[in-house]
């Protein structure tokens, strides 16, 4: 009977997460009012540049990491895009809490609305530069099996890394006492994109800067500040239960 109760509770939480995620989310700031990354970020490294030579070296590093079964499994898990409850779960140990719509509604609302604000920033830059991805250039397979979804979409900047570093910035603002753990996890999350061959290192590096630009824009939004305070209050209450 206990197992059935636990299963039902888990199903309720999962259903709540899906319903919350599927609901239309109004961003804190419209895309038109957000900083234009295409006007800020430089072009990705040219193929004959020293910076691209480093990208190739880092691509080789990423392939070496695939020999580590634990690290490559983490990189594959980090590739999750659609299920946000699974996405946030990647920071559970660092943050100290599992984030979901049912149990942490204020934190969930902050994260979902923030991502709805910053995620779209990447699209114009990707389309403008149309950079070829590593697995495309080297005609390689990906351990995360994302080839069909990613082929033909610009590599620069990395959407996963923009999102992952943005999540780290938000969680560190909620729980500054855990910032070191949170950013360490975020750093590895971003590097997972190099390991699976989805992105060049320079894509990932640029995305950390892009995420910081989006995060700074959020700080000037009164609605964001209000929701951040609610999330911080909820976090403190949950951690002291």
Question: Could you tell me what each predicted segment is?
Answer:
Residues 160-164, 197-234:
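Alpha-helical transmembrane segments that form the membrane-embedded catalytic/substrate-binding core
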Residues 22-196, 220, 227, 238-239:
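Hydrophobic alpha-helical bundle signature of multipass membrane enzymes
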Residues 1-6:
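Bacterial N-terminal signal peptides that target proteins for export
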Residues 18-20:
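Boundary at the C-terminal end of the N-terminal hydrophobic targeting segment
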Residues 233-241:
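Short amphipathic alpha-helical segments
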Residues 7-16:
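Bacterial N-terminal signal peptides
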């Amino acid at each position: 009977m206990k197992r059935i109760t636990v299963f039902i509770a888990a199903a309720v939480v999962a259903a709540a997460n899906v319903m919350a995620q599927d609901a239309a989310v109004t961003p804190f700031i419209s895309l038109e009012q957000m900083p234009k990354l295409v006007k800020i970020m430089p072009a990705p490294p040219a193929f004959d540049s020293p910076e691209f030579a480093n990208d190739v070296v880092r691509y080789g590093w990423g392939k070496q990491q695939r020999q580590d079964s634990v690290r490559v499994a983490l990189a594959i898990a980090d590739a999750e895009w659609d299920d946000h409850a699974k996405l946030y779960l990647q920071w559970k140990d660092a943050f100290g809490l599992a984030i979901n719509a049912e149990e942490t509604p204020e934190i969930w609302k902050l994260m979902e609305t923030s991502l709805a604000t910053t995620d779209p920033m990447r699209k114009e830059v990707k389309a403008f530069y149309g950079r070829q991805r590593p697995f495309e250039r080297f005609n390689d397979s990906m351990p995360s099996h994302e080839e069909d979804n990613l082929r033909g979409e610009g590599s620069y900047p990395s959407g996963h890394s923009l999102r992952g570093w943005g999540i780290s910035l938000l969680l560190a603002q909620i729980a500054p006492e855990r910032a070191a753990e949170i950013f360490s996890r975020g750093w590895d999350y971003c590097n997972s994109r190099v390991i699976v061959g989805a992105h060049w290192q320079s894509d990932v590096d640029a995305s950390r800067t892009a995420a910081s630009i989006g995060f700074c824009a959020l700080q000037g939004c009164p609605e964001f500040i209000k929701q951040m305070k609610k999330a911080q209050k909820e976090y403190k209450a949950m951690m002291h239960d």
